[in-house]
Amino acid sequence: MAVLLDPEIGMPLNQLGTLCGRSNSSADAAFFYLLCLSAVHPFEGAKDNLQILFERNEKRFLELTKQQTKNRNDKASNREIRRFLVEFLHVAHQLLESNNIGQIQESGQQTLNDFNACMFYQNDSILSDDLVFKLLSISMMLVDRILRTRSRTVKQTILFAGIAFAVALFSHVVNHAIIRLQNAFYQLHDARTKTNENDSGEEEERRQ
């Protein structure tokens, strides 16, 4: 309610992030913390909360790296999506703190590949439209944070990487939107064709 009354104040957004806890592998919380820091009147405590979130996520990322060779062929959709979310937050953390552009680009590309694969999961998938919106928003807010917080010596290079990551993420979403629209049109066409065939068959039977 406080957010609706005065969206320029960041504190309620920080509280929403805290309430989200580890929902969607902490991606929901990261969204609200970054949104809080992007507000006209940010709540500075969100920085610490975001840092704690990133540190916790790094531990999970290292665990996933150790298990990668063992579980890479696991096709359980939600497990794949949770792993992607951990990778996504790892890239976000790198964009805000790492100076290793090569590592950022490598991690970013792997994360984008996994995102593309996860977007093909539709039935009973935890990668909902709401979550995709939050991920896209995070990618844009990361660019804003890079502009505000990174040092001049690395800002331009990291900024380029952040923009490239956000644009690629958007392009994957647009591509999958087109694929799903095409599939919907094909299904509608097939349903109409089948209905017409049934109607023709019934009419033929009546004539006989």
Indicate residue ranges for each PLM-predicted region.
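Conserved structural position within tetratricopeptide repeats
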Residues: 3-4, 37-38
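Alpha-helical solenoid repeat scaffolds, predominantly canonical TPR units
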Residues: 5, 13, 32-33
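Extended alpha-helical solenoid scaffold regions that build the rod-like backbones
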Residues: 9, 61-208
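Boundary/linker segments of alpha-helical solenoid repeat arrays
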Residues: 10-13, 38-52, 61
